[in-house]
Amino acid sequence: MRIVAIPVKALGRAKRRLAPALSPLERAALALAMLEDVLDACLGHPGWETWVVSPDEAVLEVAAARRARVVAEEEGPLGRAIRQVERLAAEREAEALAIVPGD
């Protein structure tokens, strides 16, 4: 099995650099739209499982609706999410792991 993992931060923290131009709701909507695009690119490749790791329930709901595997993460730095996915992939004896940012 090969895994592509998509870490996505909590929507309340998404796209903060755009705060001068976009409201918190607009930034969250943008982050979800970008996740949808990344999921479009990652899902459906034979031999690859797509995982989404996030502390945000809304993100995980979008991922589950798209039939990606969801991995609930305790909110923290990106490195923590990647280490969590690395451990899970190793437990499943994955032959490859690709990390693709959710945005």
What are the residue ranges of the model-derived segments?
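N-terminal nucleotide-binding beta1-loop-alpha1 segment
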Residues: 1-18
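Hydrophobic targeting segments
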Residues: 3-6, 35, 49-51
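A short, N-terminal amphipathic alpha-helix
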Residues: 29-48
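Active-site acidic Asp-centered loop
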Residues: 100-102
